[in-house]
């Protein structure tokens, strides 16, 4: 209930805080951290206190393996760490970092979008290099098979 109340309070603030940002539009971004292979944190210093000045961006259209305690097996955890390391490596090697905003994810805590590194889609890189599968909200296939 508290999460729902917080979400109801935060969404109007977000809508008012950045009236220039529209879905499907590309913006320069400061990537603050890699959360996992398909999710990054970006600086959002425009968010009012007490909110964290960071938004989580989940790369739309892909699923990478989970890492750590969220993984269903040791193999998935290892692949999840590899996907995260790959994402970190691509970000570190890029000079131009941008995001393409799309929508809120189905849980409301992250923004769906794509990350462009030197103009190249992180989504495409993850899939092309075997670190992710295409995913559009359907039931996920296990990484442990």
Indicate residue ranges for each PLM-predicted region:
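N-terminal signal peptide c-region/cleavage motif recognized by signal peptidases
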Residues: 10-14
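Sec-dependent signal peptide recognition
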Residues: 2-8
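Small beta-barrel nucleic-acid-binding modules, primarily SNase/OB-fold domains
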Residues: 5, 15-145
